[in-house]
């Protein structure tokens, strides 16, 4: 068994990747990276600098100072250039811009080394859309976490309502559907399960069941000589 393990978890928006990966990272004291957040970080920079030119953003992305920390409660905190930006990355405008940034081939290429080396020399678990297919095609374990559109929309709606936001589930469902279509059809690194990924459908699983299902896959990997 390699000293540094790299776990790739891919799947559509709302499947529970972040919750599951944070829990596993905390359990094993591994590094964790939400790869979608690094695109949000680039989007935040683009909005702040009012610069949306692909080459310029790619140059900035290649040198950006970004890290994730998971606290004792299992919550992830994002830091950009030493400043916590967790809440800013969740802004709706940042999210929409991130989707545009993620479709820029030069930006995706610039961020590849960052993702591949993240957390070294620690073992690491990464979640995203193309981790197992593009970022870590040689990952020690690949998981494709998915759920029905209805289940994902329901979870996202409850999450936002829990934060005091007034949202329509129909609108959330429509946005997720649009995001799915965009992620699956983009020319560069479209969302897809790696051929050797293990699929976990969380549609009818509770949060705890989803975490334990993935944790069992990780435990099986750790038991290998």
Curated annotation (Swiss-Prot):
Residues 169-195 are annotated as: Disordered. GO terms for cellular component: cytoplasm. It is found in: Cytoplasm. GO terms for molecular function: ATP binding; CMP kinase activity; dCMP kinase activity. Pfam families: Cytidylate_kin (PF02224). One of its GO terms (biological process) is pyrimidine nucleotide metabolic process. The keyword Kinase applies. ATP binds at residues 11-19. Keywords: ATP-binding, Cytoplasm, Kinase, Nucleotide-binding, Transferase. CDD domains: CMPK (cd02020). It catalyses: CMP + ATP = CDP + ADP; dCMP + ATP = dCDP + ADP. The keyword Cytoplasm applies. Residues 169-185 have a biased composition (Basic and acidic residues). Its EC number is 2.7.4.25. It is an enzyme of class 2 (transferase). It comes from the Bacteria. Belongs to the cytidylate kinase family. Type 1 subfamily. This is Cytidylate kinase. It comes from Magnetococcus marinus (strain ATCC BAA-1437 / JCM 17883 / MC-1).
